[in-house]
């Protein structure tokens, strides 16, 4: 029989830099999970993606064991890296803060495709383009 899931915890952590300090410690500690075991596994799995924030979904079982699934970095983080900017525009209607080209847009869409609710690359590109536009980043051909 499969183990019963007691909780599902969602966190967004720096790749390769998880430590027992908040937010990891309190979130896992209240469910009785071995915090250091999670930190070591997460850091080992994400060390090649340094510099990105990687969302993680942790399933905690009734025997206090856990499994976790890492997601792709948020689209906004990928767009800001591609455009070479610190952050998006506060008011996207008035100010453009950067530009990305179609090739960069397609690369981001390919990266995000497993986590998006899309079946093909064209619709994924439209989703990412909308996110970029809302951040004040224009897409050039």
UniProtKB/Swiss-Prot annotation:
Belongs to the universal ribosomal protein uL11 family. InterPro entries: Ribosomal_uL11 (IPR000911), Ribosomal_uL11_bac-typ (IPR006519), Ribosomal_uL11_C (IPR020783), Ribosomal_uL11_C_sf (IPR036769), Ribosomal_uL11_CS (IPR020785), Ribosomal_uL11_N (IPR020784), Ribosomal_uL11_N_sf (IPR036796). GO terms for cellular component: cytosolic large ribosomal subunit. This is Large ribosomal subunit protein uL11. Part of the ribosomal stalk of the 50S ribosomal subunit. Interacts with L10 and the large rRNA to form the base of the stalk. L10 forms an elongated spine to which L12 dimers bind in a sequential fashion forming a multimeric L10(L12)X complex. HAMAP family: Ribosomal_uL11. Pfam families: Ribosomal_L11, Ribosomal_L11_N. GO terms for biological process: translation.
């Amino acid at each position: 029989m499969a183990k019963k899931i007691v909780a599902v915890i969602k966190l967004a952590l720096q790749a390769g830099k998880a430590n027992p300090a908040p937010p990891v410690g309190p979130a896992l500690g209240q469910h009785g999970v071995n915090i250091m075991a999670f930190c070591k596994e997460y850091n080992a799995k994400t060390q090649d993606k340094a510099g990105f924030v990687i969302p993680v979904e942790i399933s905690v079982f009734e025997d206090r064991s856990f499994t976790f699934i890492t997601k792709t970095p948020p689209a906004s983080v990928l767009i800001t890296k591609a455009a070479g900017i610190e952050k998006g525009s506060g008011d996207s209607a008035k100010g453009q803060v950067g530009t990305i080209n179609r090739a960069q847009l397609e690369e981001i869409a390919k990266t995000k495709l497993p986590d998006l609710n899309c079946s093909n690359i064209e619709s994924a590109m439209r989703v990412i383009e909308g996110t970029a536009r809302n951040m004040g980043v224009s897409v050039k051909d």
